Amino acid sequence: MKRITFFMLAFAAMVSSLVVAQDKPLSPQATVEGKIGPANVKIVYCQPSARNRKMLGGKEPYGQVWRTGANEATTIEFDKPVKVEGKDVPAGKYSLFTIPGENEWTIILNKEPKQWGAYKYNEKDDLLRVKVKPTKTDNFVETFNIALGKDEVQLKWENTAVAFKVKA
Protein backbone atom coordinates (compact mmCIF):
# COMPACT_ATOMS: atom_id res chain seq x y z
CA MET A 1 0.00 0.00 0.00
CA LYS A 2 2.86 2.37 0.85
CA ARG A 3 4.42 1.69 -2.56
CA ILE A 4 1.24 2.58 -4.42
CA THR A 5 0.84 5.79 -2.41
CA PHE A 6 4.49 6.70 -3.05
CA PHE A 7 4.16 6.15 -6.82
CA MET A 8 0.90 8.11 -6.96
CA LEU A 9 2.51 11.04 -5.14
CA ALA A 10 5.59 10.88 -7.35
CA PHE A 11 3.42 10.83 -10.48
CA ALA A 12 1.34 13.80 -9.25
CA ALA A 13 4.51 15.79 -8.49
CA MET A 14 5.91 15.01 -11.93
CA VAL A 15 2.72 16.07 -13.74
CA SER A 16 2.41 19.29 -11.74
CA SER A 17 6.05 20.19 -12.45
CA LEU A 18 5.39 19.80 -16.18
CA VAL A 19 2.49 22.23 -15.96
CA VAL A 20 4.56 24.78 -14.02
CA ALA A 21 7.60 24.44 -16.30
CA GLN A 22 5.88 25.77 -19.43
CA ASP A 23 8.23 28.18 -21.19
CA LYS A 24 6.94 31.43 -22.59
CA PRO A 25 6.61 31.34 -26.39
CA LEU A 26 9.67 32.27 -28.44
CA SER A 27 7.61 34.78 -30.43
CA PRO A 28 4.83 36.00 -28.13
CA GLN A 29 1.73 37.62 -29.55
CA ALA A 30 1.35 41.38 -29.14
CA THR A 31 -1.49 43.78 -29.84
CA VAL A 32 -1.12 47.49 -30.57
CA GLU A 33 -4.25 49.63 -30.41
CA GLY A 34 -4.69 53.34 -30.78
CA LYS A 35 -6.10 56.17 -32.84
CA ILE A 36 -4.77 57.89 -35.90
CA GLY A 37 -7.03 60.88 -36.33
CA PRO A 38 -10.61 59.65 -35.80
CA ALA A 39 -9.77 56.08 -36.93
CA ASN A 40 -9.19 53.27 -34.44
CA VAL A 41 -6.24 51.11 -35.47
CA LYS A 42 -5.51 47.60 -34.18
CA ILE A 43 -2.42 45.59 -35.09
CA VAL A 44 -1.96 41.97 -33.98
CA TYR A 45 1.42 40.33 -34.54
CA CYS A 46 3.95 37.94 -33.02
CA GLN A 47 7.29 39.26 -31.80
CA PRO A 48 10.34 37.27 -32.89
CA SER A 49 13.69 38.02 -31.27
CA ALA A 50 17.09 38.07 -32.93
CA ARG A 51 18.72 35.75 -30.34
CA ASN A 52 22.24 36.20 -31.79
CA ARG A 53 21.05 35.64 -35.37
CA LYS A 54 21.16 37.97 -38.36
CA MET A 55 17.48 38.47 -39.11
CA LEU A 56 16.86 41.21 -41.69
CA GLY A 57 18.86 40.32 -44.77
CA GLY A 58 19.66 36.95 -43.14
CA LYS A 59 16.97 34.62 -41.80
CA GLU A 60 14.42 37.04 -43.31
CA PRO A 61 16.05 37.65 -46.71
CA TYR A 62 15.91 40.94 -48.54
CA GLY A 63 13.63 40.97 -51.58
CA GLN A 64 11.16 38.33 -50.31
CA VAL A 65 7.66 38.70 -48.88
CA TRP A 66 7.78 38.57 -45.07
CA ARG A 67 4.85 38.08 -42.68
CA THR A 68 6.13 41.10 -40.70
CA GLY A 69 6.51 39.17 -37.48
CA ALA A 70 6.32 35.47 -36.67
CA ASN A 71 3.72 32.70 -36.82
CA GLU A 72 0.41 34.00 -38.25
CA ALA A 73 0.53 36.87 -40.69
CA THR A 74 0.39 40.23 -38.94
CA THR A 75 -3.02 41.91 -39.21
CA ILE A 76 -3.92 45.58 -39.23
CA GLU A 77 -7.49 46.79 -38.81
CA PHE A 78 -9.05 50.21 -39.37
CA ASP A 79 -12.59 51.06 -38.26
CA LYS A 80 -12.79 53.99 -40.69
CA PRO A 81 -11.38 54.60 -44.17
CA VAL A 82 -7.77 55.84 -44.10
CA LYS A 83 -4.98 56.73 -46.49
CA VAL A 84 -1.75 54.75 -46.33
CA GLU A 85 1.10 56.70 -47.91
CA GLY A 86 -1.59 58.69 -49.75
CA LYS A 87 -3.51 55.66 -51.08
CA ASP A 88 -7.13 54.98 -50.09
CA VAL A 89 -7.77 52.04 -47.76
CA PRO A 90 -11.38 51.16 -46.85
CA ALA A 91 -12.26 50.31 -43.25
CA GLY A 92 -11.49 46.64 -42.65
CA LYS A 93 -8.98 44.05 -41.52
CA TYR A 94 -5.93 43.22 -43.65
CA SER A 95 -2.75 41.17 -43.52
CA LEU A 96 0.34 43.35 -43.24
CA PHE A 97 3.22 41.97 -45.27
CA THR A 98 6.50 43.63 -46.13
CA ILE A 99 9.32 43.06 -48.55
CA PRO A 100 12.43 44.15 -46.65
CA GLY A 101 15.33 45.68 -48.50
CA GLU A 102 18.56 47.30 -47.48
CA ASN A 103 17.56 50.65 -49.04
CA GLU A 104 13.81 50.30 -49.61
CA TRP A 105 10.91 48.37 -48.10
CA THR A 106 7.59 47.51 -49.71
CA ILE A 107 4.58 47.72 -47.40
CA ILE A 108 1.72 45.44 -48.47
CA LEU A 109 -1.88 45.38 -47.26
CA ASN A 110 -3.46 42.12 -48.36
CA LYS A 111 -7.23 41.51 -48.36
CA GLU A 112 -6.90 38.02 -46.83
CA PRO A 113 -6.33 38.52 -43.07
CA LYS A 114 -6.40 34.84 -42.03
CA GLN A 115 -3.06 33.47 -43.18
CA TRP A 116 -0.32 31.48 -41.51
CA GLY A 117 2.93 33.21 -42.33
CA ALA A 118 3.38 34.10 -45.97
CA TYR A 119 3.14 30.53 -47.26
CA LYS A 120 -0.18 31.04 -49.07
CA TYR A 121 0.32 34.74 -49.73
CA ASN A 122 -1.14 35.70 -53.11
CA GLU A 123 -0.22 39.00 -54.72
CA LYS A 124 -3.64 39.02 -56.46
CA ASP A 125 -5.20 39.71 -53.04
CA ASP A 126 -3.10 42.83 -52.41
CA LEU A 127 -5.10 45.95 -51.70
CA LEU A 128 -2.02 48.14 -51.94
CA ARG A 129 1.75 48.22 -52.15
CA VAL A 130 3.79 51.28 -51.21
CA LYS A 131 7.53 51.80 -50.95
CA VAL A 132 9.23 53.46 -47.97
CA LYS A 133 12.83 54.07 -46.93
CA PRO A 134 14.29 52.38 -43.85
CA THR A 135 16.39 54.28 -41.33
CA LYS A 136 18.95 53.15 -38.76
CA THR A 137 18.01 52.95 -35.09
CA ASP A 138 20.22 54.48 -32.41
CA ASN A 139 20.21 51.23 -30.43
CA PHE A 140 19.91 47.55 -31.30
CA VAL A 141 16.28 46.33 -31.06
CA GLU A 142 16.40 42.67 -29.98
CA THR A 143 12.67 41.93 -30.27
CA PHE A 144 10.63 42.96 -33.32
CA ASN A 145 8.31 45.80 -32.39
CA ILE A 146 5.38 47.61 -34.02
CA ALA A 147 4.15 50.93 -32.63
CA LEU A 148 1.68 53.63 -33.59
CA GLY A 149 2.89 57.20 -33.95
CA LYS A 150 0.75 60.31 -34.39
CA ASP A 151 0.21 59.62 -38.10
CA GLU A 152 2.28 56.53 -38.83
CA VAL A 153 2.93 52.87 -38.12
CA GLN A 154 6.49 52.15 -37.00
CA LEU A 155 8.34 48.84 -37.39
CA LYS A 156 11.67 48.31 -35.57
CA TRP A 157 14.07 45.40 -35.41
CA GLU A 158 17.82 45.03 -35.07
CA ASN A 159 19.22 48.36 -36.29
CA THR A 160 16.39 49.06 -38.73
CA ALA A 161 13.33 51.28 -38.41
CA VAL A 162 10.61 51.54 -41.05
CA ALA A 163 7.57 53.82 -40.87
CA PHE A 164 4.61 54.33 -43.16
CA LYS A 165 2.14 57.20 -43.05
CA VAL A 166 -1.51 56.65 -42.13
CA LYS A 167 -4.07 59.47 -42.25
CA ALA A 168 -7.78 59.29 -41.54
Where are each of the predicted segments found?
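Bacterial Sec-dependent N-terminal signal peptides
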Residues: M1-D23
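Targeting-peptide/extracellular-domain and disordered-appendage signature
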Residues: A21-P90, S95-A168
